[in-house]
Regions:
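Outer-membrane beta-barrel porins/channels
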Residues: 1-176
Length: 176
């Protein structure tokens, strides 16, 4: 997972309704609503995100001979995400309307998504002292984060990427 949380108020907005800050033209919404300060990304209030990911991988493995084995795992994925304080980006979103009436960008609490993938693996003993392993996991196509469709490319898409793994085990001495 990933979690960040920063306090708001690092950038002064001057008098309410007066456009005179480093965030000028970036976040007119906060000035219009009477904000007196911004966070580091020209939004209002605290700034942060929270992403949690869980992958369940029930595995079937079998030896194909005395030195090699193969495994397969269906992957079941679950994600939870929330963002806060990103209202400074509202002007850059594809959603029409004002931030107050059409918010699929920030401050919506937790949203979740799920998806599926596959992992294949191999392990082989090359000698009495060297064993290699390799695995490949497909991209996990996840359902979209509908509450944050203006934040992510693909209107809320946040897939888990494919990945490759390699490993080597070396037995330094027969005593180990």
């Amino acid at each position: 997972g990933m979690n960040t949380d920063y306090p708001g108020g690092q950038i002064s907005a001057g008098a309410p309704g007066v456009v005179d800050t480093v965030c000028d033209g970036f976040n007119g919404t906060a000035v219009a609503s009477g904000a007196t300060s911004y966070n580091m990304l020209c939004g209002t209030g605290r700034l942060g995100i929270d992403l949690m990911q869980l992958v369940i991988a029930p595995t079937f493995a079998m030896k194909i001979n005395k030195d090699h084995s193969l495994g397969v795992s269906p992957l079941i994925g679950y994600q939870r995400f929330k963002a806060k304080g990103l209202d400074g980006f509202q002007g850059f979103t594809p959603s029409p309307g004002t931030f107050a009436t059409n918010n699929n960008l920030t401050n919506n609490g937790y949203d979740s998504s799920h998806g599926f993938g596959l992992r294949l693996g191999w392990m082989g003993r090359l000698s009495d002292s060297v064993t290699l392993g390799a695995a490949y996991s497909t991209k996990m196509r996840m359902s979209k984060f509908s509450q944050y469709k203006d934040l992510f490319a693909g209107r809320g898409a946040f897939d888990m990427p494919e990945n490759f793994n390699l490993g080597i085990a070396v037995k330094a001495t027969p005593a180990l």
